[in-house]
From Swiss-Prot:
Quaternary state and interactors: Monomer. Binds 30S ribosomal subunits, but not 50S ribosomal subunits or 70S ribosomes.
GO biological process: one example: maturation of SSU-rRNA
Gene (UniProt): rbfA
Family per record: Belongs to the RbfA family.
PROSITE patterns membership: RBFA (PS01319)
Gene Ontology CC terms: cytosol
Compositionally biased intervals (Basic and acidic residues): 133-142
Protein name from the UniProt record: Ribosome-binding factor A
GO MF annotation: an example: ribosomal small subunit binding
Acidic residues composition-biased segments: 143-162
Main location: cytoplasm
Domain of life, per lineage: Bacteria
Chain positions covered by the region annotation Disordered: 119-162
HAMAP family reported in the protein's UniProt record: RbfA (MF_00003)
Length: 162
């Protein structure tokens, strides 16, 4: 939505629908619905309204709220048309917003990662951070290692020109 006019229409639709749900729609199936976002098509003929049902985690309450919103769609559309003063009011589509559930799952994953980090940090205090003897010692010459063959282009630490 790069068009500022479309963005203003979307913001106004969000305010009008939220006020209508709070004050004028008295459907008992409608839970505590919060309008989180509104997206309007470029020709302002369709508006997608994202909502959440707060305080109720069961699927039955979500379904009941969705049915209540669908039944109030005509009243909401006529009020949006009246408030916006547009010749053609956009058709409204209600979509349950999954963002709060995703955010909660992400918070749980981050909390588990933090607990694992704290457990690792507690374990680091009891163990050495590396080898028990960190000092370098000369390695014994193994029979498996090839001798210095003196291949040209290979540096053996001795200058051959002298």
């Amino acid at each position: 939505m790069s068009n500022p006019r479309i963005r203003k229409i979307a913001d106004r639709i969000q305010v009008v629908v939220a006020e209508m749900l709070e004050r004028r729609i008295k459907d008992p199936r409608l839970g505590f619905v919060t309008v989180t976002d509104v997206r309007v098509s470029g020709d302002s003929q369709q508006a997608t309204i994202f909502y959440t049902v707060l305080g109720e985690d069961d699927e039955a309450a979500r379904t009941a709220s969705a049915v209540a919103l669908e039944s109030a769609k005509g009243l909401l559309r006529s009020e949006v048309a009246k408030q916006l003063g547009m010749r053609h009011a956009p058709t409204l589509e209600f979509v349950h917003d999954a963002l709060p559930e995703s955010a909660r799952q992400l918070d749980e994953v981050l909390a588990r990662a933090k607990a694992q980090d704290e457990a690792l940090a507690a374990g680091r205090g009891t163990a050495y951070a590396g080898e028990a003897d960190p000092y370098k010692k000369p390695r014994p010459a193994d029979a498996d290692e090839p001798d210095d063959s003196g291949e040209p282009g290979e540096f053996d630490g001795v200058d051959d020109d002298e």
